[in-house]
Amino acid sequence: MTPAELSELITETARTTLDAHGLDSSVVPESATVERPRNPEHGDYATNIAMQVAKKAGTNPREFGTWLAESLGAHEGIDEATVAGPGFINIRLAAAAQGKIVEDILTVGANFGHGDELAGAAINLEFVSANPTGPIHLGGTRWAAVGDSLGRVLNARGAKVTREYYFNDHGAQIDRFARSLVAAAKGEPTPEDGYGGDYIQDIASQIVEANPDWQKLGADEAQELFRSQGVELMFAHIKRTLAEFGTEFDVYFHENSLFESGAVEAAIQKIKDNGNLYEADGAWWLRSTNFGDDKDRVVIKSDGNAAYIAGDIAYVADKFDRGHNLCIYMLGADHHGYIARLRAAAAAMGYDPQQVEVLIGQLVNLVKDGKAVRMSKRAGTVITLDDLVEAIGVDAARYAMIRSSVDSSLDIDMDLWASKSNDNPVFYVQYAHARLCSLARKAEDLGVTREGADLSLLTHDREGDLIRTLGEFPAVVKTAAELREPHRVARYAESLAGTFHRFYDACQILPKPSDDEQTVAENKALFAARLSLAAASRQTLANALELLGVAAPERM
């Protein structure tokens, strides 16, 4: 019985118990909180539902708790239910009910941890969206890992997710990029407001090689040549880097297409027509304060050019018009002001601003030999995704980025994450998976199978710990999806790995070479049960790593 199944049983029993005593059962919530007690001697799980609903139902927590514990204790899957303190109910599962978790995992396999509570959600998940003016930096790397993992988690709980990259190929930064490339091609210094680094010279050299007569062009033509081909080459590099990092997108949306298609012009006209745009000081302003922003925003500047928010307005409308009912933006630490701005853009266009979510990721710092690493030879001024992968590998880079909440800044110790030690979280988790695979191979060599497993024999404390940890996985994934926090899956994987290692050290899973035939025969059902528990652990660990986009190696 998983915690989710136990929660359902508790709520059903609470309703029938209140009905039986002539009390109001409508006060029982849809789900009951089920937690592991701090002291294992108190039982496998505990719930505070009696304290939540007793007063509303017309009784006191202790009395209702006593009734409920008695009813729960009569259930075949529960060995014991007792009331403690002001009304806590401690529950100990029957051995067979605990073992059923193992059976369920082995039955559903790769789908263990999946659910359907987000069925019907069509989510546009936009992340990374780095400017095509340079390689992806550490902030973008964090979103490349976290965004991809979040997409996997949301999919696992039933949502249809479109992973989208907004390609900022319109605006002044592209002009500066083009001027930087032209300067590099001419052997001139980088413009004061331009972009430097080896990658600029590399791209400029590629354009020169492909266009040997470029110097015959006029200044404007040369600028346009380096602009268009430079953006194309940078875009190809970004896509290749992301693919090698294990991050794929369903849609690469070009900002410039919003202007070329007339979408920006149409959006501006729409908000003019609905009264959400007004003219002042020679410019046109969005009444964004009407929708919770701290100030109105310029949409058309006094020189007649569209401000950046004009593209945002057209873009959010395009997302909803494509059939999405939730738009999640994953933005950098310097984008806090965009939360109200993007919601105002949606509201001004007639969409529900509550269907716009903005996640803000904090800064990432690298540390090596105890010192901050700040420079990249490749990019000139910042550390890139390519630099990080070269130093510690894809799996370590992804795991390091995902395992902490994006609400806090992140320091990555490159020496730690490159090490092959249990102090390295990704090594620790992957080693547990490899150890489980090795165990399965050894069982096959010995002729030990899961056939005839009696899961009710799994009564050792370490077995119980492992089973309960396995049972938590669906709730962990569900919460990770609800809160947009895939780091919960990474922390769970570490907890599961540690719980498995303790089980492995405490319980004999396979026959020893010194065991005689009689001993092996007498323990056949137990060995099969423990091998089943190990197989369920391997499956769950593999499922967690899949949600993180991290490899689950069979050998290390």
Swiss-Prot record:
Any one Pfam family match given in the protein's UniProt record, by short name: Arg_tRNA_synt_N
Localization (cell): Cytoplasm
An example Gene Ontology molecular-function term: arginine-tRNA ligase activity
Motif 'HIGH' region boundaries: 130-140
Top-level class of the enzyme under EC nomenclature: ligase
GO BP terms: arginyl-tRNA aminoacylation
Keyword Ribosomal protein: no
Domain of life: Bacteria
Keyword ATP-binding applies: yes
Family: Belongs to the class-I aminoacyl-tRNA synthetase family.
NCBIfam families xref list: argS (TIGR00456)
Protein known as: Arginine--tRNA ligase
